[in-house]
């Protein structure tokens, strides 16, 4: 199973999730692809992801932004391979300045980002990673996250730091073949 883990205030309908889904469909492997709609509470999101991974042992993960943070915790707990796309490294620090009302731009759902969310994120922090499990795909022009934090966190992992670009990784389709190869979907 290939599991795509979307980011903060995102959803299964995100650009990159749809691209991966379309490619899996073209490969006639859509039944091997899952994009769960994650709850905004980190503990609830992680419970949902753990259930999915436990139902499909040996899954590969693609984690984008906050989804990369979640994927890192899952990779270390379940020994999974992960492609990280502009991953959040310390979201508990980044989001602590954004407490208050939030709106998911894809679903329209509104909620309050609280200190409890931050505490739940902090509890998922992984101090040291197993580099061979990861392929980091990041853009130096990411306007939301400092790509250098990911380069440092995943030192020793396969890394592609692509100059310029932005957090949304608008040309993700150009890298889809290598992403799917790392995940074991294609040769």
Where are these regions (language model features)?
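Active-site glycine-rich loops that stabilize anionic/oxyanionic intermediates
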Residues: 6-10, 65, 140
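Gly/Ala-rich beta-loop-alpha elbow adjacent to hydrolase catalytic centers
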Residues: 62-71
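Active-site phosphate/pyrophosphate- and oxyanion-stabilizing loops and adjacent acidic/basic residues
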Residues: 18, 22, 72, 148-151
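Short active-site oxyanion
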Residues: 57-60, 133-135
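Aromatic pocket-lining residues of Rossmann-like dinucleotide-binding sites
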Residues: 74-78
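The alpha/beta-hydrolase serine catalytic core
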Residues: 81-187
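Active-site catalytic motif of lipid deacylating hydrolases and related acyltransferases
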Residues: 1-56
